[in-house]
């Protein structure tokens, strides 16, 4: 009694949070302060392995107290799309200045030019198609706002119908007229280059659909009756994929309205299901950011250059630099809109419930008590479990993640710190602004000076909003850190 345990003495422990009914309990709101059973497992220790059994306090599941962040103003979707469209038009305008600039400051004795641009060299049909492609999100937001359902007055319904009809008719007529002119003027290769990004759009955003397995482009004449029926079914599956992809794309256009919610529960299976849904939602938002930014940079920087005559000189290095600036700036602006502060806080709450595991060398814990991992248990911090012939140590307050699942580890790594996304965006946007300021001070050409000065304004606004969200979230989490430490000390 009170002596040191021998190597053959049996250790007893209770399964962590596996009491009946514990897996189905759930809580609401922003906290999960329901009474949680503590786990006290005795374990053998050894001084030669370098790894000791965690203390009793480390094996007690501490209730999570989620931080309540203030409600930050969210920009309306139609205003955001107007702002993004305006920034893209500015970038397109400065690129046309780079391509079609003139020597208007020369005296009349030199080659005369009364305007700052060679307007007679600009193809306005190509400019119209490029403008419509860049403004597709803004046009879609107008149509969505004009298609709202509900009880509205007769005058308002007529006004919404006329707005929707006018926008769609004007856009469709302008696009068809410009495309017909381009078909008559340019070769098939040029038109293929113009429409190339849309050919990659659906395959990039498809919903777990493998085009290599469908053989959609096989010859119909070589198919028998059964193959024809199966090919028709595959084509229907393909069009279903297109429809679902377009629905997801249009849903992601309006980030704040489609914001998911957090279910603060104590069921391990429900927590993992919520994390899977949030992973899918986050991946969709990142795909939308990547595709939209690359599409904007493509039509701003590359399309005008491709249709320039071979005898026309322009600064190729500046065109490539503009492509990078537009792609990075558009990515940051879209991520700031699709990943607001409330969404970062939502991902952080889910990561706190999910927990994380660290793989441990079995040779260092051979004499330490190890529990077999079960999916219906909520494991406390510091406990050792066996899973897939490996040993893992629990790191979070709640640990319901699958130890061998790399996606769960990545989710907890990225979102365990609620400020990580905002910090990355701030560093990226700050680096772009510093580079633009350096280029602005060192530039000697008038068109580059105008271009950098105009593009800087959009980056200033995005940097201000990111800095505001970062400061507010940082203050909120710093205030909630001390009560959480007091709660941890009380449970220990």
Curated annotation (Swiss-Prot):
GO cellular-component term (any): endoplasmic reticulum membrane
Biased amino acid composition, Low complexity: 31-53
Lineage: Eukaryota, Metazoa, Chordata, Craniata, Vertebrata
PANTHER family: FI21814P1, TRANSMEMBRANE PROTEIN 39B
Protein name: Transmembrane protein 39B
Keywords tagged on the record: Endoplasmic reticulum, Glycoprotein, Membrane, Transmembrane, Transmembrane helix
Summary of the function given for this chain in its UniProt record: May protect the cells against DNA damage caused by exposure to the cold-warming stress and facilitates tissue damage repair during the recovery phase.
Family according to the record: Belongs to the TMEM39 family.
InterPro entries: Uncharacterised_TMEM39 (IPR019397)
Transmembrane segments: 77-97, 115-135, 153-175, 185-205, 288-308, 322-342, 421-441, 447-467
Any Pfam family: Tmp39
Residue segments, region Disordered: 1-53
Membrane topology of this protein: Multi-pass membrane protein
Compartments where found: Endoplasmic reticulum membrane
Glycosylation sites recorded in the entry for this protein: 8
